[in-house]
Amino acid sequence: MVWRQAKWDEPLIFELNNSGANRQGLLINKDDEIRSEIKEMKIPKNLLRENGPNLPSLSELEVVRHFIRLSQMNFGVDVGIMPLGSCTMKYNPKIEEKATAITESHHPLEDEDHVQGILEMIYELQNWFSEITGMDECSLQVPAGSAGEFAGVLMIKKYHEDHNRNYKDTMLVADTAHGTNPASAAMAGYKVMYVKSNGEGLVDMDILREIVNDKTAGFMLTNPNTLGLFEENILEISKIIHSANAILYYDGANLNGVLGIARPGDMGFDIVHLNLHKTFAVPHGGGGPGAGAICAKGELVNYLPYPMVEKVNGKYRLSKIPKNSVGKIATFYGNVGNLARSFAYLLGLGPQGVQMVGKMSTLATNYLIAKLRDIKELELIAPNRHRKHEVVFSVKQLMENYGVSANDVAKALLDSGFYAPTIYFPPIIEEALMIEPTETESKETLDMFAEALKKIVEDAKRNPEQLLKSPSNTSIARLDQAYANHPSTITPTYRVLKLRRMGKINYLK
């Protein structure tokens, strides 16, 4: 596949019109009927701006072309495969954009009787996510997966406090865990202790038995883990954790690999957080805000964030407050627009479709492994084990023998028209390439990706110096990362840029 990205010398939108010409569009006067109804709005003087907003004076056409050009220098799943491991960058059907539009004309403070349809949707999602995860109840109040994770850790802390177990001050975290796991635990005031993996990439059971004690508050784990391996000892892990009156916490980042096939609740987990922007078709990052869910079973449902939707006398009400709730994690009721996306996604799939997601994502990963298995420079921990949603290769041999790193391989993939996989994660794998193809990619796409990776390995052995110059087909080549991130040069906003140009900022603190 021949691919070359567009390259525009595109200025910032604030700097597009340097002539100073006024290209402002049509100003529409207030409607007379509205004016007579509300009169003039009386805004306190201390809230009024001293000067008008510093907006560029541009025509509609200039604005459209500006953003189209920027989009041509970007890359997303609508352009090609994005195999970012542990990110689940699946294609999100466009029909779901229509679903989220139903929330745009409503306000979170609107009367509940006016938004019965939205509340019914949230109510159904609460039940669906509880069923999918094997939990008893679910709260959608959290605005994102990481916020749901933090809420889950707060639930563990409050639960132990209510049971006079303040001595439980340590949270166990798998060494393959996402960075948010130890971060959430530390934010909640816990000491963090890592549980090492064994030679097969699974939780080392001997180490786990040795370190679990009365001070253990919980164990944060993904299953499948971040190597794409299913923790086959999960039931025994559950027994060990519960024997210490600790909580088994499920990070839902990797749920896609077992979706509709295995449920965390049946594995012995007590609390689950979900990333709707991974598993349930909500766009990532620049595509829009994330969305989360936090689910629990048994006594722990009493600690879920509020409010939750319940059905009272045939009406849906945001009135359910668990008796020991950790409270609100954010204002209002989560990212409702994104909940609508997930609702449409699940409604379209149905139970059998949900199960196919887990099966096809697993099939895609293992097909890719089969295509790449004979390349000795792509090392695989526990090579005879099947993977679930993702796989981690090590290119340590390329680095040792030819000076080609995981970063270099990722840059070379960009030149082939593929987004780079996650690199250097998890940190227990040297020179890691973490690949998650997802269920939405075709066999043909996986074949092309595998061939591109094979060619890069051969190029690394034949002409490593040339490979180190990649990428050359992208809009921007390699960045000087130290320069870009140094406090004396990092420029995150236009305001900072202007202050730098005026010499008013030297270092960002």
Swiss-Prot record:
Top-rank taxon, per record: Archaea
One Pfam family in the UniProt entry: GDC-P
GO biological process: glycine decarboxylation via glycine cleavage system
Transmembrane segments: none
Catalytic activity: N(6)-[(R)-lipoyl]-L-lysyl-[glycine-cleavage complex H protein] + glycine + H(+) = N(6)-[(R)-S(8)-aminomethyldihydrolipoyl]-L-lysyl-[glycine-cleavage complex H protein] + CO2
Alphabetically ordered keywords of this record: Oxidoreductase, Pyridoxal phosphate
Gene3D superfamilies membership: 6.20.440.10, Aspartate Aminotransferase, domain 1, Type I PLP-dependent aspartate aminotransferase-like (Major domain)
GO cellular component, one term: cytosol
Signal peptide: none
GO MF assignments: glycine binding; glycine dehydrogenase (decarboxylating) activity; pyridoxal phosphate binding
Cofactor(s), names only, from the UniProt record: pyridoxal 5'-phosphate
N6-(pyridoxal phosphate)lysine PTM positions: K278
Enzyme Commission no: 1.4.4.2
Keyword presence, Cell membrane: no
Subunit structure: The glycine cleavage system is composed of four proteins: P, T, L and H. In this organism, the P 'protein' is a heterodimer of two subunits.
Function summary: The glycine cleavage system catalyzes the degradation of glycine. The P protein binds the alpha-amino group of glycine through its pyridoxal phosphate cofactor; CO(2) is released and the remaining methylamine moiety is then transferred to the lipoamide cofactor of the H protein.
Family statement: Belongs to the GcvP family. C-terminal subunit subfamily.
UniProt-listed NCBIfam families: PRK04366.1
Protein name from the UniProt record: Probable glycine dehydrogenase (decarboxylating) subunit 2
